[in-house]
């Protein structure tokens, strides 16, 4: 990992921690889970017994990790496609910064629509919040249909950019054990 690129890009982004890319982070073992619990983070159980750290991460402060030196192994080793492309010189830092800004803008649009509906627990990953809002009983009025269509379109725009620029494919595939999209609780 190139420290100057991570300082430049990752600290402006945070999408891998805020529930936009992933529903949760799979931990490596009980020791890692206990260490995070001692730091005050809630760890959920999973089939492997290692534990899951739900997203959005409670340690995220703005766009930065509040436990950076002690973050889980999965977080230490993950590099999004955009960071990899910047490291290879396939995309300039300026272009990468613009993609991050565009992703944040699209995500904020989804959050604004959810807020207008009064829907979605902010402690849930973005896609789950949308699914809850869309599954809610808002009736069959013209206004409800308009809101649903707007939310679906906004979330589709987010997912398209995320898969293309951050998870490494124009198609929705499993790019991480807990990736948003086809792999996330659908």
Which residues are covered by each model-predicted region?
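Hydrophobic scaffolds flanking metal-cofactor catalytic centers in soluble metalloenzymes
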Residues: 1-186
């Amino acid at each position: 990992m190139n420290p100057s690129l991570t300082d430049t890009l990752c600290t402006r982004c945070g999408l891998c921690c805020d529930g936009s890319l992933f529903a949760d982070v799979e931990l490596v073992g009980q020791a890692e889970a206990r260490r995070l619990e001692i730091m005050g983070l809630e760890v959920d159980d999973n089939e492997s017994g290692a534990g899951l750290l739900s997203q959005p991460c409670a340690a995220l402060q703005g766009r930065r990790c509040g436990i950076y030196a002690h973050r889980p192994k999965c977080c230490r080793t993950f590099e999004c496609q955009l960071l990899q492309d910047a490291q290879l010189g396939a995309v300039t830092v300026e272009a990468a910064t613009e993609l991050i800004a565009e992703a944040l803008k699209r995500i904020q649009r989804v959050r604004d629509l959810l807020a207008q509906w009064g829907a979605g627990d902010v402690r849930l990953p973005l896609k789950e919040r949308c699914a809850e809002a869309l599954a809610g009983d808002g009736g069959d009025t013209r206004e409800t249909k308009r809101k649903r269509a707007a939310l679906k379109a906004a979330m589709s725009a987010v997912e398209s950019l995320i898969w293309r620029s951050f998870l490494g494919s124009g198609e929705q595939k499993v790019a991480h054990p807990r990736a948003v999209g086809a792999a996330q609780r659908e």
